[in-house]
Amino acid sequence: GLDSKRVFKGADYNELGRLVGLEFRSNPTVGLEDGPLFQIGAGGDKYMSVLQMARVREVTLEKQFNDTWDHTLHWQQLKVLNKAYTDYKEAKNKLDFVDMIEKFILEGSSPKFDLLIIDEAQDLAPLQWRMVKEVLVPNSKETYYAGDDDQAIYTWMGVKLEDFLKASDKKIVLDKSYRVPSTVHSFSQDLIKKVSLRQLKAVSYTHLRAHETLMN
């Protein structure tokens, strides 16, 4: 396994910040599975977010910089950070979370699975999809992608909903929800029908009142 001493941590970000004249305030070790890997905070956090977003989206740094539309960021500073970050990790033999995914894909080996279930698959970014499709699926006898495109909220993080909707030719759409009361469902449909890219669903919902469901 990976030695924890090799993981890029807070002390490393502090030292990197001193080298490039930037401040990192957010928790930089948050993983993709925990939500936002890309923190919005001090200047250093925003620059680091651009670096990591480019890698997870698998686009060039310049494209990510242009797509970010943050006029408080400067291209030259981003390039300086990118080089310093890469050089620091190489000199100190450190890995960040994205490095771990890239290394896993490059090595191309995983345990053998009889059944692989990819939960919350609507939230996978392009790099994660490569990990799933190129490494995990070939080592699995059967694969299920579980998710709900109506709950896809991480497009800002590079997630492409098309990747989830096209993940499998065979789809099973559940026809009953015990989570959402009918009153909430009725209201939500007026909003979600404005979304053009989505899986159509014919779902029946519980007739419990909203406050009864929330109390359970």
Regions inferred by a protein language model and the residue ranges of each:
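Generic structural signal for secondary-structure transition and capping sites
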Residues: 24, 28, 196-197, 213
